[in-house]
Amino acid sequence: MQVLNFIIKNILTQASVVVGLIALLGLVLQKKPIGTVVSGTMKTILGFLVLSAGSSVIQGSLAIFGDLFNKAFGLKGLVASIEGINGQSMTDLGLGSEIAITLAGIFIVNIILARITPFKYIFLTGQALLWESTLCVVFAYFCGLRGLPLIIVGSIVGGAFATLMPAFAQPVMRQITGSDDIALGHFCTFGYMFTALIAKLTGDKSKSTEDVALPKSLEFLQDTYLSVMVVMVPFYLIVAIFAGPKACAEYAGATNYIVFMFLQALQFVTGLYVLMAGVRLLLAELVPAFQGISMKLVPNSKPALDCPVLFPYAPNAVILGFIFTTIGSIIGMFLTPMLGLPMILPGVMSNFFAGGTAGIFANQVGGRRGTIIGCIAHGIFIMILPALLSPMLGQIGFQNMTCTDVDTVVTGFFFMIIKSIAGIF
């Protein structure tokens, strides 16, 4: 058991190590020379770590922006945080071991299902699997399951989600990437496909966000990072002005608050640059290495990777998705109390990563107009679903808490429906 716990806590929860081991296995199965195996494995890990470093820079900048945004406009409500649910389930309920073992079980079930079903997707986003494991264990626990039955049920449900969600998104993914080499491993798939549906109904895919014609004086905006900067700097400065110097001083210290927020906007752009460099390095090594697994262990399988791998395909759509998902989430924030549900505060980080990815999906099937309309709808959607789950979590002891990723929310709904059908309620 100690060995298993060590593997789970130190390997399976370290996404860079998992991805590196997958690359190692793939290269070994292809009988590549030792130098190629070492190089490919290390570059895969390095690519993932560079991606993660960029993501961390973005998250740090957005955390400041999000806190000051709420203070600037006096917003109060629930903050959706699956991290909080994970922490309480381990400290108050003592479910840490069950969550860890279920995480390993989900990965095993995913591989088995990929082997025996037509859905050949290996889910490689370790952090997302941890959150799915948390929700599966928590809701299985409150359905009355304990010990081994809890772990088995949680593993099967989580493994099914890890297999089916990439399959659900793959028709649009093929259009976005122009190939069938990679899949999406991010538990916001219901939101992405909902956005794509709205975009397809309301948009025109022939007018892409990436084909905007600019006058010569604005041609510099064709540089992805400069165009992001032009959008984000005003966002940050407006929030700084409304929040005021006192609120900003907590983060800015002795630096002028306007200058500080200007630099934070540039920090965001820097993080995006690093993230995209990591994506390119990761895909250049992982996709060829994964062919070994595809050929030997799970024939025709595809790696399901985290959402930032899509950002280079439509960078303008990422920014539009972020902006209009944020607008939609603000609308949703005021709409939920009108529906008798708790008010959920918009999460800036989820708006960027999930909203940006939703923008790519929307643009692919609905162009610019579809991206705008679809992402506003997406913002409302990702406010309403967590608000619906919050009372259910309250019933089982998680007061004033809810989740962010909509697929984990759907997992909660699934368990509660099964509980009702079984008559345990």
Predicted regions and their residues:
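Helix-loop-helix junctions within the multi-pass membrane cores of secondary transporters/permeases
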Residues: 20-22, 38, 70-88, 194, ...
